[in-house]
Amino acid sequence: FAPEMEVIRFPSWDCLPYDRASPTLRTMAARIGTLHRLQQKTAKPQLILTTANAATQRTLTPFRIRQLVATLKPGERIGRDTLAALLQANGYVRTDTVHDSGEYAVRGGLVDLFPSGEEQALRLDFFGDEIESVRTFDPADQRTTGRIDGFTLLPASEALLDEESVKRFR
């Protein structure tokens, strides 16, 4: 209907408010990715597909999202433990094997993660405290599929349990 327009999907949480179940990591990742995308300058007009439910749910402020974003690339100096702490603080869940958005795993000199807003899972290869390479991999068989120059690390969740977020969600 409008091929020059960028269509951006903003889903509602896939659970009921005050339910015992939390939204899935994939849904929260999609929402965070959209909120980050809307802050980027673009030459194309944007169309946001959403529901009234999604539009009225509380989320992180634009300032808070910008505060939590990190750009990582080969040559960047960040220790594996520092990165693991950053991922934990940004709502990522540590697992033995990465299968879905919002998960990460630390294995020796490798950190596997599936960042919010990314189409593929990533494998960071460390040499000491320096990122040596960033490769994509298939979560189904864990095999490397390519190499990228870097990526933007977004929060995995809108419900971060720090002081500011707890105040905002009340």
List PLM regions with ranges:
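ASCE RecA-like P-loop NTPase motor cores
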Residues: 1-170
